[in-house]
Amino acid sequence: MDNEMIAGTEAFLRQTFADSAYFRNNPKDRDYRLEHSYRVANIAKNIAEAEGFDVAHAVIAGLLHDIAYCEEMVTREDHMNHGRRGAEIARPFLEGLGLAPDAVNEICYGIAIHVDDRADFEWERTPFCETVGDADNIYRFDAYRIYETLQFIKFSEMSLDEKKAKVTGTIEKLNSLKEMKLGTATAKNLWLQRLDYYIGFYEKMMAQFENSTAIL
């Protein structure tokens, strides 16, 4: 793995975020996006190591996949386009690293399609390219996101019946997500591990709720 190239990418990402007028006015968003980028890059690294992909390229793609968030996103279209815009921002930097044109295109294609599976340039949809979106999706089911989700939906303010209904629906949705296709066997295994972790958590929560109104 080319640690010097990765260090340069980290510096580029941090500087881009530091130069962002939007992030200067929204430092919490900046901090979250940076932390998220590292988490996705580490998942991409794990997939690349297991699948025999270029690990440095996978880490770079993970670090830069959300770089477009340096720009304020007002509309839903802005958010849907942030993969393509991110690839546009990343390309000159990647070319400056001296990467081969095919490597630049593959990284940029992975960044471009990670939101809605669409790019604005032609390239082969390789398992490497799918790794960016797969890593991003796997991240959505890490431990901290449980806390964030419950806080966002104001779970603590719900009645017991509302909590039970929400947890039941969540478990059903999590089980349905097991059928989702991913680009590699490694990503699929990580995906299933995360889903099982979540299902186990919510099943334990439901068991606690069942013990909350009567002696069983």
What are these regions (language model features)?
Residues 78-86, 103, 127-130, 134:
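Short acidic-hydrophobic sequence patches enriched in Asp/Glu that either
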Residues 1-83:
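Acidic/His-rich, divalent-metal-binding segments that scaffold phosphate/diphosphate chemistry
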